[in-house]
Amino acid sequence: MRKTFLAGNWKMHYTSAEASIVAKKIATEVKTLKDDVVIMITPPFTALSKVSECIKGSNILLGAQNMSYMESGARTSEISPSMLLEFGVEYVILGHSECRLYLAETDEIINKKILAGLKHPFKYLILCVGETLDERDSGKTLEVVLNQVKKGLNCVSESDIQRIILAYEPVWAIGTGKTATKEEAEEVHKAIRLEITKLYSKSASDNIIIQYGGSVNSNNVKELMNEPNIDGALIGGASLKAESFLSIINNVL
């Protein structure tokens, strides 16, 4: 049975002090969790050190929102895998739609980041995929998403696929208040899982975690998680307040 992974993505919100307050509240409340539920929080780079201290000894995983595929060099503003590991980062979100849009990250660049991350001892790398509203309206959802999956996982071995989490985030549902229906989300998740079977094996497909992201909140999370191919959520706005994130967690337990 696959575990449920609930990851909060705090994006460009909170100073170190503000992030620490929220992290402490969450860590205090999730001391006792079922073994099949994993909680993850992803603060801004500048808050990683403080948040790492706040959740030390808890069962919360610390994540980063992006990283360079280079280990060092002339890459102004970027951060390397080794730098993240120094802060105790255990997973990295890669290929988020906002990075694809605002930072012009291509599937090829994202794949380089995936392969670079696999050379380091991160527990997980989260590969985000998703279609725009125009692509959905044109009936290209599965074509776009599965192409992103294939390109993102290029040259990833079957032994390494167990460290990959896939996150389906329809671009039109991120930060808009719109959410894919459980049927729409399940259709894409099912197709992604089938694609993993084709690319790797039935065993890899059965074990890979596929999260849903896109305006997830305490009101819709349970019905989404009840779908057979949805294994968790990548949560943006609703993870910024400890109370709302904890409400989501409690609704899944």
Curated annotation (Swiss-Prot):
InterPro entries: Aldolase_TIM (IPR013785), TIM_sf (IPR035990), TrioseP_Isoase_bac/euk (IPR022896), Triosephosphate_isomerase (IPR000652), Triosephosphate_isomerase_AS (IPR020861). The keyword Nucleotide-binding does not apply. GO terms for biological process: gluconeogenesis; glyceraldehyde-3-phosphate biosynthetic process; glycerol catabolic process; glycolytic process. Pfam families: TIM (PF00121). GO terms for molecular function: triose-phosphate isomerase activity. Substrate binds at N9, W10, K11, G175, S215, G236, G237. It is found in: Cytoplasm. Pathway: Carbohydrate biosynthesis; gluconeogenesis; Carbohydrate degradation; glycolysis; D-glyceraldehyde 3-phosphate from glycerone phosphate: step 1/1. The active site is at H96 (electrophile), E169 (proton acceptor). Disulfide bonds: none annotated. Keywords: Cytoplasm, Gluconeogenesis, Glycolysis, Isomerase. It comes from the Bacteria. Its EC number is 5.3.1.1. The keyword Cytoplasm applies. One of its GO terms (cellular component) is cytosol. It catalyses: D-glyceraldehyde 3-phosphate = dihydroxyacetone phosphate. It is an enzyme of class 5 (isomerase). NCBIfam families: tim (TIGR00419). Involved in the gluconeogenesis. Catalyzes stereospecifically the conversion of dihydroxyacetone phosphate (DHAP) to D-glyceraldehyde-3-phosphate (G3P). Homodimer. Belongs to the triosephosphate isomerase family. This is Triosephosphate isomerase. It comes from Borreliella burgdorferi (strain ATCC 35210 / DSM 4680 / CIP 102532 / B31) (Borrelia burgdorferi).
